Each structure stands twice: as structure tokens, then as C-alpha cells.
């Protein structure tokens, strides 16, 4: 099924390549982008339909640590779907971390198992930034940022991450309460 969808999507670009209206390099970039898109959609459909068969087909022959895929627009969505699938295979084992709000830690841990070099750095930064942008201020993002900064001290992504990191740290910093604040005691009998 994946091959037939890919062939259908690439047919217009095949003719453009044959007539030299696009370069081989552009054709390869488009092919990687379409493959990422198709696999990502298949994976999402498989999750929604709870179809093991569709999810398996979505990742059949998929190499997550491919330079070819890194340039595709849907690469990070596909990587998150791939990592989530791997985590679901261990759902009982990971539930304590899920309950503790460690979902990004789990996803990044999966990335570390299958990605290397620039692909790992990019996926790690993307996952972290995507979580930080949500402004849920997950405390797990603090040590993840510190680990990223230690591992990739010259990463261009650090500039984008630092502002969010500072916001998250400020949110979790102990707050000094004013002495003028008074707390009610014996509130059990108060009717709302």
C-alpha cells in the first residue's frame, strides 16, 4: 500500500524530472518529504483505528537515522509517531513515568536509541521546543535542557531554547509569599 501511494504522489514529479524541470536533488527532497508525509499519516490512522497492521506498515523499512529524511518537512512528526509507537510496545513499563509527567523524557529517550549526530540533536531540540512552546511549564524540561546544553554546547538550537528555559525555571522557582497573606483555618464548616 505504501509503495502504491508513494508512486501516485510522485508521478507528477517523475515527469518534471524527465523533462529536466526539476533537478535530481530536488526530486529526492520531494520524495523524502512525500515518504515522511505518507508514513506519518498512516501511523496516525493506525493509532486512531487501533490497527496494529496499519501502524506496522507505516514503519516497515523505515530508517529513522537517515540523512535523507532529515530534510523532509514531516520528519519530526514522523519521528514522534515512531517513538510513540516504540513506547506503546512497553506501555506497562513506562506508565510510572507517564503518570509522573515524563512524556518528553520518554520520547527523547527513544530518539537516543535510534538517532545519531545531527538527526538526534535536531529531534531532541524539536521535541523540547514543541513542549516548551505549549507553556505547560513541565518541570522535566529543566533537566532535559541542561542535558542538551551539556551535550551540544555549540548547538544553534540553544538560542531558541534559552528564553523558554528561563521562563520554565522562573515558574518553578520558590516564591516568597507576603507576610500580609492570611490563610483561613477551620474551613470544614464553611458552606459554598
Question: Which stretches of residues belong to each language-model region?
Answer:
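Oxidative protein folding and maturation machinery
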Residues: 1-191
Amino acid at each position: 500500500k505504501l509503495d502504491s501511494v508513494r508512486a501516485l504522489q510522485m508521478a507528477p514529479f517523475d515527469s518534471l524530472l524527465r523533462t529536466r524541470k526539476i533537478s535530481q536533488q530536488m526530486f529526492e527532497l520531494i520524495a523524502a518529504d512525500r515518504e515522511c508525509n505518507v508514513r506519518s499519516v498512516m501511523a496516525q490512522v493506525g493509532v486512531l483505528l487501533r490497527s496494529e497492521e496499519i501502524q506496522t506498515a507505516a514503519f516497515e523499512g523505515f530508517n529513522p537515522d537517515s540523512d535523507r529524511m532529515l530534510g523532509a518537512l514531516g520528519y519530526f512528526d514522523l519521528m514522534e509517531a515512531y517513538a510513540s509507537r516504540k513506547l506503546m510496545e512497553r506501555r506497562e513499563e513506562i506508565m510510572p513515568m507517564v503518570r509522573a509527567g515524563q512524556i518528553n523524557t520518554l520520547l527523547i529517550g527513544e530518539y537516543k536509541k535510534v538517532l545519531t549526530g545531527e538527526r538526534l540533536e535536531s529531534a531532541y531540540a524539536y521535541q523540547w521546543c514543541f513542549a516548551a512552546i505549549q507553556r505547560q511549564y513541565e518541570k522535566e524540561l529543566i533537566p532535559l535542557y541542561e542535558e542538551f546544553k551539556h551535550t551540544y554546547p555549540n548547538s544553534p538550537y540553544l538560542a531558541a531554547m534559552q528564553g523558554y528555559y528561563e521562563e520554565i525555571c522562573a515558574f518553578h522557582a520558590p516564591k516568597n509569599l507576603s507576610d500580609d497573606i492570611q490563610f483561613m483555618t477551620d474551613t470544614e464548616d464553611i458552606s459554598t
